[in-house]
């Protein structure tokens, strides 16, 4: 029997990396994060497991071009999310080796903000994360980004929220036209104000996914495009 396991490769920007005394402290922090992501994924009731394959911690010296070249100096230094996700997707499309090749999803965790660039060279910080719709398993589209300002719950929510975009769900209240997968049911029947993770997140429902999100993810799982997340069950 097959098990559904979504494998993640995490890369961190220099601003996030330097918050930690050591690489092992950073890796422990990210590992704890995935316990939280698993708990949220469990609310889909689709038997989806998450697995962290590895972490690459970039420093100012080793940051790849997609990070360095797109940093808006500010102050504070920040990114335009659309520009960054596009550059990151292209970068990993052209660098399919090692964990980047083997993984189902690649996430950048950044300690810098994201938002809309203003004319004066600063950025209106308004975006916690961004990801490619239904991009799981597709080498050129399996990227996502989560900002981390060190509030544990917010961080886990963002990672789970962006993961589910990659697994084929739009925001609650959005139709199938916003999913990059033909035939998707979309989520127009679940209003954002119901407060789920893909909606406006109220106290009652902010730690679970809506019935529409479940249907969208279930639909993606039924398609050949999701083949990489099915694997033989471990004992």
From Swiss-Prot:
Keywords: Calcium, Disulfide bond, Hydrolase, Metal-binding, Metalloprotease, Protease, Secreted, Toxin, Zinc
GO process terms (BP): membrane protein ectodomain proteolysis
Subcellular location: Secreted
Cofactor remark: Binds 1 zinc ion per subunit.
SUPFAM superfamilies the UniProt entry points to: Metalloproteases ('zincins'), catalytic domain (SSF55486)
Entry annotated with the keyword Magnesium: no
Cystine pairs: 137-228
Record comment: activity regulation: Inhibited by EDTA.
Any Pfam family matching the protein: Reprolysin_5
Cofactor: Zn(2+)
Domain Peptidase M12B: 4-233
InterPro entries tied to this protein: MetalloPept_cat_dom_sf (IPR024079), Peptidase_M12B (IPR001590)
Annotated Zn(2+) binding sites: 161, 165, 171
One GO term describing the cellular component: extracellular region
PANTHER family listed in its UniProt record: ADAM A DISINTEGRIN AND METALLOPROTEASE DOMAIN, ADAM METALLOPROTEASE
Similarity annotation: Belongs to the venom metalloproteinase (M12B) family.
Name of this chain's protein: Venom metalloproteinase antarease-like TserMP_B
């Amino acid at each position: 029997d097959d098990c559904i396991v979504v494998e993640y490769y995490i890369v961190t920007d220099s601003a996030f990396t330097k918050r930690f005394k050591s690489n092992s402290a950073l890796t422990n922090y990210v590992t704890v994060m995935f316990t939280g992501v698993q708990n949220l994924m469990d609310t889909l009731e689709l038997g989806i497991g998450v697995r962290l394959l590895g972490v690459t911690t970039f420093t100012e010296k080793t940051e790849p071009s997609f990070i360095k070249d797109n940093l808006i100096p500010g102050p504070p230094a920040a990114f335009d999310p659309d520009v960054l996700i596009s550059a990151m997707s292209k970068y990993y499309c052209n660098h399919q080796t090692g964990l980047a090749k083997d993984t189902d999803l690649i996430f950048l965790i950044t300690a810098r903000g994201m938002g809309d660039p203003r004319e004066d060279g600063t950025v209106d910080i308004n975006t916690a994360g961004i990801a490619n719709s239904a991009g799981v398993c597709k080498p050129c589209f399996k990227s996502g980004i989560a900002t981390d300002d060190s509030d544990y719950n917010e961080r886990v929510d963002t990672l789970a929220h962006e993961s589910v975009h990659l697994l084929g769900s739009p925001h609650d209240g959005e139709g199938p036209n916003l999913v990059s997968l033909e035939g998707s049911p979309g989520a127009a029947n679940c209003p954002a104000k119901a407060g789920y993770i893909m909606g406006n997140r109220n106290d009652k429902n902010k730690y679970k996914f809506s019935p529409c999100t479940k249907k969208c993810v279930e639909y993606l799982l039924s398609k050949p495009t999701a083949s990489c997340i099915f694997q033989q069950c471990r004992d």
